[in-house]
């Protein structure tokens, strides 16, 4: 596989982001699909925020989606991913999880993944990467990577 880049989102990513966030399959467990205005608002409030809550991920200059990477609590970073359907089942989410865990560890933090119970792929990746299920918060299942994993 080629190298994945994690980078700051840019205003010019709005159209590619819209194609992803307007897809019903992508948004199935998140929210109703976004229209252009909602996509632009999300980009402003989450991607262009300081510090960002999400970052773009690309391969060969093509935006594949975004990763979630922001403070969850004083000791942890929340991480996750939202990817174009053509990236599903190809190991992208697993590779991105490894990269984000590495970033969190370099910052002296551990990592947390939250998902709805129906997100079996997310749960599978969390478990495969040695995240421990720690309970539910606001209807979301919470997985935490033990320190030094």
Where are these regions (language model features)?
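Acyl-donor (CoA/ACP) binding surface of acyl/acetyltransferases
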Residues: 1-15, 19-25, 57-149
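Conserved GNAT-fold acetyl-CoA-binding loop/helix
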Residues: 25-44
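Juxtamembrane/interface motifs at transmembrane-helix termini
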Residues: 36-40, 48-50, 84-86
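Sparse recognition of residues in long alpha-helices and their boundaries
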Residues: 33-34, 54-55, 142
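Charged, low-complexity, helix/coiled-coil-prone segments
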Residues: 38-45, 66-72
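Secondary-structure transition/capping residues
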Residues: 28, 37, 50-54, 111
